[in-house]
Amino acid sequence: MTQSKPKRRQGTRGARKPVKTTMADYAMSFERLGQWMSERARSPTLRHPQATSLSMLDGAVTAVVAGPVSMAPEEWVCPLLGVDPDAFNHDTEEFSAIAATLIRHNAISETLSTRPESFEPLFVRSSDGEVDTQPWCMGFYAVMKMRLLAWSRLLSPDTIEHDLLSPMGCVTVI
């Protein structure tokens, strides 16, 4: 007669948390990111983000991707989300927001580098169907201001880039 080992009790003791291995494992949903930014912008105690909506963040991330100079993530993510650089080092809600933002960055980068004609800015649409481009342009301009000197040659009226930036209203703001 063979003896069988006693079965281990099923329970939470000894249970392992799922291992997070990719940025997507850490990221909050894009919809949750919008709520998080809105809550943060209204908070009287937290550092306010420069991007207060998904549309504004989308414009900002697009400027980072399409801009004339590369920027380290800490340079643009921290001010846009209103977080400290230390947030990159912890498994917190702030890091989940950072991860979601970087995933959006990668998606925009992929689209603009492989299928630019399919890029669709995330504009705000009112209940009556009106499209409001202002938040997106404000986000784009927020990043331009971070590196205004680098952008300045693109804003010269003699360049094709000037003509491309003009419809967004970014040129008139400067």
Predicted feature descriptions by range:
Residues 1-174:
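Domain-length accessory/inserted modules outside core catalytic folds
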